[in-house]
Amino acid sequence: AGVIKESQYPFGKGLFEIKTGIGRKKGLTKKQLKAIFDYKSENETTNRYKDLWIFIYLCNGINPTDMLKLKFSDIVDGEICFVRQKTERTTKNRKEIRAVVSSQLQTIIDKWGNKPLPDNYIFPYMKGHETAIERKAIVRDVVKRINKRMKLIGEELGIGNITTYI
């Protein structure tokens, strides 16, 4: 069951070939990163979403879904510890990811986060009673807001469009 004859296999040279995407440059230079990190706006909302982008960056490119699911109980011995939501239900590749809570991360948490109680989410977007559809909508909204503010910052700094996809 589940085995096909070699003659029926649809993939390979001269048969169906899976197209590879054209790569695009996603990296930022150290100079560009410094400009983003140093950027200050008079608009508090812009600063908030820039800080969330920096949080994502400093947490090894944490997925926004995972970032919004983080609780204070996920901070253990000065490290944020989590399993990617994308892989948490698989038995293989269920690797715990760790990010050191640097002074910059701690500043972002202190400035924009909830009260530091173990059961509290770090950031005030999830409440804990949302349905899967509501959680997805919250994540989509936060990503949209981060991307909107980072696009403005990127334009102002002459970097171009900066997004959560890093």
Predicted ranges, named:
Residues 6-64, 68:
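Basic, Lys/Arg- and aromatic-enriched nucleic-acid-binding interface segment
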Residues 42-44, 137-140, 144-166:
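Short, basic (Lys/Arg/His-rich) helix/loop patches that form interaction surfaces
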Residues 13-14, 69-111:
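Conserved tyrosine-mediated DNA breakage-rejoining catalytic core shared by Y-recombinases
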Residues 2-6, 26, 147, 158:
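Extended, non-catalytic subsegments within catalytic or DNA/protein-binding/adaptor domains
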Residues 2-9, 113-119:
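Proline-centered turn/helix-capping motifs that create local helix->coil transitions or kinks
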Residues 34, 57, 65, 80, ...:
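Feature representing long, continuous alpha-helical segments
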Residues 19-22, 107-148:
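Major-groove DNA-contacting interfaces characterized by cationic-aromatic clusters
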Residues 19, 27, 84-90, 129:
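Catalytic-site neighborhood detector that most strongly recognizes the C-terminal catalytic loop/helix
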